[in-house]
A protein has these predicted regions:
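Beta-sheet-rich non-transmembrane sensory/scaffold domains
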Residues: 1-362
Length: 362
């Protein structure tokens, strides 16, 4: 993972370093450097596997004195991903076992005041769909994984020791999306219908499935949308073939987690795929401004903005055709103006009615 986190005046930078056919006498070919200095051995974490060729290097920088690093650590792995809570960093990667099964190795590091400390590591069965499948809350780590042809929920304590689990969920399906919200977790599996599961995690030793809603299609991305609502962006079949799938917006009422309801949906007949499925940062979801912005491929490449209220359901505010290969289209707003960024072109619109104001080609 190449990313960064800002926490209490310190910037934590995550960078990658790959090792390829190093010469033993040239240490810089297999030991990461920070500020042109090799990491010391006590700052390198080794894996159990012998095949790791990639480092994730975490570097702490005091933003008041950015020319100096306060700490660095290198974790050797095979292209792991990262999740950061307010106090801890978790690096996780999928491990292929000899029997063909998959497990997830998790390593935990505490961070604060510019210091990084290794805490614990463990493995759980299965693999994580994305970073929304892992969450820390009140000192416990909660995960939802796909295990072979079933799925599981795991709860781990501060030492990454298992306190509770639910296994053998949704046979022959896999997890498509997840979202943890306090003591409740939601996750979607799919084969022919979309089961949206609700799990009560208030007792770390005894997680319980408390709800299961089955509807057509599936949600690839879940996002809280105001009080008691959960937005889903996914797909629904428009026929008997996967080629007939179309992008779908769903709004779920989660005011009662044991009785979740899909209270509205809209299927975009001309949209076959959305970047929301792979990159959540491409989605603009703001309940206060009532904005749901996302990009789709289909009959034409389009950036959509929808709103939602309980009386009218989903309403379209704007549909703007973008460039043909506009994978990185983004929508943002500042005060009363919405900006659509498409490659080297920026367009501005009034938030009140989405009338175009201006455009700029860089």
């Amino acid at each position: 993972c190449s990313t960064s986190r800002l926490n209490n005046g310190y910037l934590y930078v995550f960078s990658q370093y790959s090792v390829n056919n190093p010469e033993e006498e040239r240490k810089e070919q297999y030991i990461p450097c920070v500020n042109e200095e090799l990491l010391s051995l006590d700052k390198i974490c080794m894996p159990d596997t012998e095949s790791a060729r990639n480092y994730t290097v975490i570097t702490a920088i005091d933003i008041q004195n950015p020319s100096e690093t306060t700490d660095s650590i290198g974790i050797l792995s095979d292209q792991g991903l990262c999740y950061a809570s307010a106090e801890n960093i978790y690096l996780y990667e999928t491990i292929w076992e000899e029997d063909g099964g998959r497990t997830t190795e998790i390593r935990k590091f505490s961070y604060g005041e510019g210091k990084l400390t290794g805490v614990a590591k463990t493995r759980v069965n299965g693999y994580l769909n994305d970073s929304f499948s892992i969450d820390e809350y009140n000192g416990y780590l909660r995960l939802v994984t796909t295990v072979d042809r079933t799925n599981a929920v795991y709860v781990l304590d501060e030492k990454l020791e298992e306190t509770g689990k639910i296994e053998n969920l949704a046979k022959d399906e896999r997890i498509y999306s997840a979202r943890f919200m306090g003591d409740i977790g939601y996750f979607v599996t799919y084969r022919e219908t979309e089961p949206l599961f609700s799990v009560d995690l208030s007792d770390p030793a005894n997680p319980k499935i408390i709800g299961e809603l089955k509807i057509p299609g599936f949600s690839e991305y879940l996002h809280p949308y105001g009080d008691g609502l959960l937005l889903g962006i996914g797909m629904e079949d428009d026929g008997n073939d996967e080629k007939d799938r179309r992008v779908k917006l769903s709004m779920f009422d989660i005011s009662d987690p044991s009785n979740v309801k899909e209270i509205d949906k809209i299927v975009l007949k001309d949209s076959y795929y959305s970047t929301a499925f792979e990159d959540y940062k491409s989605v603009l979801a703001d309940a206060e401004k009532n904005l749901i912005g996302f990009f789709t491929y289909g009959e034409r490449e389009t950036y959509h903005i929808y709103g939602y209220d309980r009386v009218h359901g989903f309403t379209c505010k704007m549909q703007e055709t973008t460039g043909k290969y506009a994978w990185h289209v983004r929508g943002v707003y500042l005060q009363d103006t919405f900006y659509l960024i498409d490659g080297n072109q920026i367009e501005s619109y009034r938030l009140a009615d989405f009338e175009k104001v201006d455009d700029l080609i860089l």
